[in-house]
Design a protein with these regions (language model features):
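Extended basic (Lys/Arg/His-rich) segments that typically form rRNA-contacting surfaces
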Residues: 1-207
Protein backbone atom coordinates (compact mmCIF):
# COMPACT_ATOMS: atom_id res chain seq x y z
CA UNK A 1 0.00 0.00 0.00
CA UNK A 2 2.33 2.70 -1.27
CA UNK A 3 2.21 5.59 -3.70
CA UNK A 4 4.10 5.55 -6.96
CA UNK A 5 4.32 7.06 -10.41
CA UNK A 6 4.11 6.16 -14.11
CA UNK A 7 6.86 6.72 -16.64
CA UNK A 8 7.89 6.02 -20.22
CA UNK A 9 10.77 3.63 -20.83
CA UNK A 10 13.48 5.40 -22.84
CA UNK A 11 15.92 2.50 -23.12
CA UNK A 12 19.03 1.12 -21.43
CA UNK A 13 22.54 2.38 -20.84
CA UNK A 14 25.21 1.94 -18.16
CA UNK A 15 26.79 4.03 -15.45
CA UNK A 16 29.94 3.56 -13.37
CA UNK A 17 30.00 3.40 -9.59
CA UNK A 18 32.75 4.76 -7.31
CA UNK A 19 34.83 1.59 -7.86
CA UNK A 20 34.60 1.87 -11.64
CA UNK A 21 32.20 -1.06 -12.01
CA UNK A 22 29.82 -0.76 -14.98
CA UNK A 23 26.17 -1.10 -13.89
CA UNK A 24 23.34 -1.61 -16.43
CA UNK A 25 20.50 0.85 -15.94
CA UNK A 26 17.12 1.59 -17.50
CA UNK A 27 16.18 5.23 -18.10
CA UNK A 28 12.56 6.20 -17.45
CA UNK A 29 10.98 9.53 -18.39
CA UNK A 30 8.59 10.80 -15.71
CA UNK A 31 6.30 13.52 -16.97
CA UNK A 32 2.83 14.85 -16.21
CA UNK A 33 1.39 12.53 -13.55
CA UNK A 34 -1.60 13.97 -11.69
CA UNK A 35 -4.16 12.58 -9.25
CA UNK A 36 -7.46 12.38 -11.15
CA UNK A 37 -9.60 10.56 -8.56
CA UNK A 38 -9.48 9.69 -4.86
CA UNK A 39 -11.23 6.45 -3.92
CA UNK A 40 -12.32 5.65 -0.36
CA UNK A 41 -13.95 2.69 1.38
CA UNK A 42 -17.15 4.71 1.80
CA UNK A 43 -17.59 5.50 -1.90
CA UNK A 44 -15.72 2.74 -3.74
CA UNK A 45 -15.15 -0.07 -1.23
CA UNK A 46 -11.38 0.41 -1.04
CA UNK A 47 -8.78 3.13 -0.52
CA UNK A 48 -6.80 4.15 -3.60
CA UNK A 49 -5.76 7.07 -5.74
CA UNK A 50 -6.16 7.16 -9.50
CA UNK A 51 -3.22 8.69 -11.34
CA UNK A 52 -3.59 10.13 -14.85
CA UNK A 53 -0.55 10.12 -17.13
CA UNK A 54 0.34 10.52 -20.79
CA UNK A 55 -0.73 14.05 -21.75
CA UNK A 56 -3.28 14.45 -24.52
CA UNK A 57 -5.46 17.34 -25.71
CA UNK A 58 -8.91 17.42 -24.09
CA UNK A 59 -10.51 17.84 -27.52
CA UNK A 60 -9.11 14.44 -28.53
CA UNK A 61 -10.74 12.61 -25.61
CA UNK A 62 -14.24 11.16 -25.32
CA UNK A 63 -16.92 13.24 -23.62
CA UNK A 64 -17.16 11.00 -20.49
CA UNK A 65 -13.38 11.12 -20.08
CA UNK A 66 -13.33 14.90 -20.47
CA UNK A 67 -15.98 15.21 -17.77
CA UNK A 68 -14.02 12.93 -15.45
CA UNK A 69 -10.86 15.01 -15.86
CA UNK A 70 -12.64 18.36 -15.56
CA UNK A 71 -14.18 17.22 -12.28
CA UNK A 72 -10.72 16.67 -10.85
CA UNK A 73 -9.36 19.90 -12.31
CA UNK A 74 -6.65 18.12 -14.33
CA UNK A 75 -5.71 18.65 -17.97
CA UNK A 76 -5.97 16.09 -20.75
CA UNK A 77 -4.53 12.60 -20.18
CA UNK A 78 -4.93 9.38 -22.12
CA UNK A 79 -3.95 6.72 -19.54
CA UNK A 80 -4.91 5.97 -15.96
CA UNK A 81 -3.60 3.75 -13.20
CA UNK A 82 -4.20 3.16 -9.50
CA UNK A 83 -2.18 2.88 -6.34
CA UNK A 84 -3.70 1.38 -3.20
CA UNK A 85 -3.00 3.68 -0.26
CA UNK A 86 -3.74 3.56 3.45
CA UNK A 87 -4.83 7.19 3.90
CA UNK A 88 -6.36 8.67 0.72
CA UNK A 89 -7.11 11.88 2.62
CA UNK A 90 -3.37 12.67 2.50
CA UNK A 91 -3.74 13.48 -1.21
CA UNK A 92 -5.63 16.12 -3.19
CA UNK A 93 -7.37 16.07 -6.56
CA UNK A 94 -5.16 17.53 -9.27
CA UNK A 95 -2.01 17.06 -7.18
CA UNK A 96 1.10 16.51 -9.31
CA UNK A 97 3.33 13.53 -8.60
CA UNK A 98 7.01 14.14 -9.32
CA UNK A 99 10.43 12.58 -8.80
CA UNK A 100 10.45 14.06 -5.29
CA UNK A 101 8.76 10.79 -4.26
CA UNK A 102 12.05 8.92 -4.74
CA UNK A 103 15.62 9.12 -3.49
CA UNK A 104 18.89 7.57 -4.66
CA UNK A 105 19.46 4.14 -3.12
CA UNK A 106 15.76 3.54 -2.51
CA UNK A 107 14.21 0.16 -3.38
CA UNK A 108 11.21 0.24 -5.71
CA UNK A 109 8.88 -2.17 -7.49
CA UNK A 110 8.43 -1.89 -11.27
CA UNK A 111 5.51 -3.32 -13.24
CA UNK A 112 5.20 -3.40 -17.02
CA UNK A 113 4.03 -5.44 -20.01
CA UNK A 114 6.55 -7.79 -21.59
CA UNK A 115 7.21 -7.77 -25.34
CA UNK A 116 4.72 -9.97 -27.21
CA UNK A 117 6.28 -12.82 -29.20
CA UNK A 118 3.13 -14.30 -30.74
CA UNK A 119 2.51 -18.06 -30.93
CA UNK A 120 5.59 -19.99 -29.82
CA UNK A 121 6.48 -23.65 -29.45
CA UNK A 122 7.70 -25.52 -26.38
CA UNK A 123 11.40 -24.94 -27.06
CA UNK A 124 11.06 -21.16 -27.17
CA UNK A 125 8.22 -20.78 -24.66
CA UNK A 126 9.27 -23.26 -21.95
CA UNK A 127 12.92 -24.01 -22.82
CA UNK A 128 12.19 -27.69 -23.56
CA UNK A 129 14.94 -29.84 -25.07
CA UNK A 130 14.66 -30.91 -28.71
CA UNK A 131 14.26 -34.47 -29.83
CA UNK A 132 16.97 -36.35 -31.78
CA UNK A 133 17.93 -34.54 -34.97
CA UNK A 134 19.35 -37.56 -36.85
CA UNK A 135 19.18 -41.38 -37.09
CA UNK A 136 15.76 -41.34 -38.69
CA UNK A 137 14.01 -39.48 -35.90
CA UNK A 138 11.07 -37.31 -36.94
CA UNK A 139 10.53 -35.99 -33.39
CA UNK A 140 12.57 -32.79 -33.64
CA UNK A 141 10.44 -30.12 -31.97
CA UNK A 142 7.29 -32.05 -31.07
CA UNK A 143 5.89 -31.71 -27.53
CA UNK A 144 5.92 -35.43 -26.74
CA UNK A 145 3.31 -36.98 -24.47
CA UNK A 146 0.82 -34.58 -22.89
CA UNK A 147 -0.90 -37.17 -20.69
CA UNK A 148 -2.02 -40.78 -20.34
CA UNK A 149 -4.90 -42.52 -22.17
CA UNK A 150 -8.17 -43.47 -20.49
CA UNK A 151 -6.83 -42.50 -17.07
CA UNK A 152 -7.09 -39.56 -16.61
CA UNK A 153 -8.36 -39.28 -20.18
CA UNK A 154 -7.73 -35.56 -20.31
CA UNK A 155 -4.95 -32.99 -20.35
CA UNK A 156 -4.34 -31.44 -16.94
CA UNK A 157 -4.88 -27.68 -16.65
CA UNK A 158 -1.62 -25.74 -16.71
CA UNK A 159 0.19 -28.31 -18.84
CA UNK A 160 3.18 -26.67 -20.52
CA UNK A 161 2.36 -26.58 -24.22
CA UNK A 162 2.79 -24.33 -27.24
CA UNK A 163 0.88 -21.05 -27.07
CA UNK A 164 1.03 -17.29 -26.83
CA UNK A 165 4.34 -15.99 -25.49
CA UNK A 166 4.89 -12.57 -23.96
CA UNK A 167 2.52 -9.59 -23.73
CA UNK A 168 2.01 -10.37 -20.05
CA UNK A 169 2.11 -8.31 -16.87
CA UNK A 170 5.55 -8.64 -15.25
CA UNK A 171 6.68 -7.20 -11.90
CA UNK A 172 10.32 -6.71 -10.86
CA UNK A 173 10.74 -6.25 -7.11
CA UNK A 174 13.45 -4.60 -5.00
CA UNK A 175 15.27 -2.78 -7.76
CA UNK A 176 17.44 0.18 -6.80
CA UNK A 177 17.18 3.84 -7.77
CA UNK A 178 20.70 4.77 -8.96
CA UNK A 179 20.26 8.26 -10.39
CA UNK A 180 17.66 11.04 -10.49
CA UNK A 181 17.73 13.96 -12.94
CA UNK A 182 14.98 16.37 -11.84
CA UNK A 183 15.72 18.96 -14.53
CA UNK A 184 15.04 16.40 -17.29
CA UNK A 185 12.55 14.31 -15.23
CA UNK A 186 14.58 11.14 -15.78
CA UNK A 187 14.86 8.23 -13.36
CA UNK A 188 17.64 5.62 -13.70
CA UNK A 189 16.90 2.20 -12.20
CA UNK A 190 19.32 -0.70 -11.87
CA UNK A 191 18.77 -3.57 -14.29
CA UNK A 192 16.35 -4.28 -17.13
CA UNK A 193 12.57 -4.11 -17.14
CA UNK A 194 9.74 -5.56 -19.25
CA UNK A 195 8.63 -4.00 -22.51
CA UNK A 196 10.26 -2.07 -25.31
CA UNK A 197 11.02 1.61 -25.74
CA UNK A 198 8.08 3.96 -25.05
CA UNK A 199 6.29 1.33 -22.97
CA UNK A 200 4.67 2.62 -19.79
CA UNK A 201 6.15 1.38 -16.50
CA UNK A 202 4.52 1.61 -13.08
CA UNK A 203 7.06 2.46 -10.37
CA UNK A 204 5.91 1.89 -6.79
CA UNK A 205 7.71 2.85 -3.60
CA UNK A 206 8.51 -0.10 -1.36
CA UNK A 207 6.10 -0.45 1.59
Amino acid sequence: MAIGIFGEKLGMTHIFDDQGVSIPVTLIKIDGCQISQIKTCETDGYNAIQVAHGEKELSRLSKPLRGHLEKSGTKGFKSFGEFTVENPTDYKLGQSLTLDLFSVGQAVKVTGTSIGKGFAGNQKRHNFARGPMTHGSKNHRLPGSIGAGSTPGRVYPGKKMAGHLGNAKVTIKNTEVLYINKSENILALKGSFPGKRKNILKITKKD
